[in-house]
Amino acid sequence: MNTKLVVVFLLSAILFVSVTASRPGKDLERDEAYETYDDERPYFKRACKDNLPAATCSNVKANNNCSSEKYKTNCAKTCGEC
């Protein structure tokens, strides 16, 4: 009975070590890459475009409404947020 208990304990210890060693976030270089990625605003860099029609964004810029968060995001190209 004791040998079975020892074998079960060793197998569970090996399983625990293998699971915790493969968790994301243990690699410092990868964590640093995530931090720099979060600091950037990739949604403006990847696709700098207007989500609203061109006429709407032109009117927003003409009326100086680019400071509104709604238009700052949806008319990013026209308002110069890229």
Curated annotation (Swiss-Prot):
Residues 1-21 form the signal peptide. Disulfide bonds join 48-82, 57-75, 66-79. Residues 22-46 form a propeptide. Pfam families: ShK. One of its GO terms (molecular function) is toxin activity. Transmembrane segments: none annotated. Keywords: Cleavage on pair of basic residues, Disulfide bond, Nematocyst, Secreted, Signal, Toxin. One of its GO terms (cellular component) is nematocyst. Residues 70-71 are annotated as: Theoritically crucial for binding to potassium channels. Residues 48-82 form the ShKT domain. It is found in: Secreted; Nematocyst. Probable toxin with unknown function. In contrast to similar toxins, this toxin does not inhibit voltage-gated potassium channels (tested at 100 nM). Does not show antimicrobial activities against bacteria and yeasts. The 52-Leu-Pro-53 bond exists only in the trans-isomerization. Belongs to the sea anemone type 1 potassium channel toxin family. Type 1b subfamily. This is U-actitoxin-Oulsp2. The lineage of its organism: Eukaryota, Metazoa, Cnidaria, Anthozoa, Hexacorallia.
